[in-house]
Amino acid sequence: MQKLSSWILVSLIALLGGYLLRDRLGPFDGNIDSNSQQKSPQSLAIGGDHQAVRSKAFTPPETLRIASFHITAFNANKSSNQKIIDILARVIRNFDVVAIQGIQSHDQTFVPHFLSLINNDGAQFEYELGPQVGRNTNQQQFAFFFDKQTVEIDRQATYTVADPHDRILYEPLVALFRARTLNSETAFTFKLVNVHLDPINTSEELSTLHDVYSVVVADVDQEDDVLLLGNFSTDTNGLFDWGNSFGIQPTHQHTTA
């Protein structure tokens, strides 16, 4: 676990109504089962080689740009519109890490194909895809797309938070990242929690999210730079009120909506 070094500033940017929160919470109360956390299927994770292709003049970025993007019903139908898919790919290229919600495709070639569109201009992105979450026909997948030239992911530390009591509709996807630097021992590390709350039960799920956060900060890696990001299904005021009630302070944030 590394602290923020003097040369790097993390700029947290939420897209389309996503918000980012950060704090350290107290002990977990046991309602979410951390012992049954599920790893994301490794068969769905590409890019086993974590070494980025760099020029000899590689310079670590001074800023990491992290975004959240809820793409409603992101499937083959939507991606068949070339204009839409080109815009989505172009947006993602502007960031170092993008948390995606709303993937609804059972075609295992869908996400790799989207990745190829992101990289068709020479970009070097990879992704981590979580399992199907939700109930019955109301299911989706979460993903992280990231620029492997600026960040790397610990795939062994990626998991979906288990919810044995079914308190949250879409179980969050958690991933541990590290900024790529010339000295890996001083690199900034951080954990992202990709969430989409049920708009019908937002109040109840916001309460559950407090427990989810506690599980994540209590992980064995003891990473204390933890960010919640995604679609919280509430407006800024509602989210800030919730955060304040648990002692969580929102970060500086921008939205496109």
How should these model regions be labeled?
Residues 2-257:
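Divalent cation-coordinating acidic motifs and surrounding scaffolds
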